[in-house]
Amino acid sequence: MSSHLNWMIIRNNNAFLVKKRNIKKPFSKEPNNVTNLNSYRYNGLIQKKAVGVVENPDRKGFTVVYKKAKATNKPAKNAVRRQFKAGARRSLYKVKRLLKANHYRTDLSKATLRRASAILRSQRPIKAKKPKAAVAKTE
């Protein structure tokens, strides 16, 4: 089946949709959707080439999951997982090179880099805040 026909089938009704009141466009929780928007362009289920970013279980780095266009009819061989733990700048540079080498769309690669950097930012240790001078004097 074509991706357009698949989209027409799953567009308004699938297990990954998140519909809420006062939100015009529903969100999506599907695995390879980097923007979490329910749209044909970013849908990870129907596109031949899709990319997703997930956090590593040990909270050190992230994993990029991408689909190979050649193995569309073989779901077991379709997904490729690559872990990145080298450090923030180096990992993001490697992801950028990976997506460029596999000829992914630029909007997908930008969204992927944004998601990966958000994951790395969430893994940073939280700095202890110093007490303010006024509060310290009164105690």
Curated annotation (Swiss-Prot):
Family annotation (Pfam families): Ribosomal_L28e
Keyword Nucleus: no
GO cellular component entries: ribonucleoprotein complex; ribosome
Gene Ontology molecular function terms on file: structural constituent of ribosome
Keywords: Ribonucleoprotein, Ribosomal protein
Example GO biological process: translation
Family classification: Belongs to the eukaryotic ribosomal protein eL28 family.
Listed name of the protein: Large ribosomal subunit protein eL28
Organism ancestry: Eukaryota, Metazoa, Ecdysozoa, Arthropoda, Hexapoda
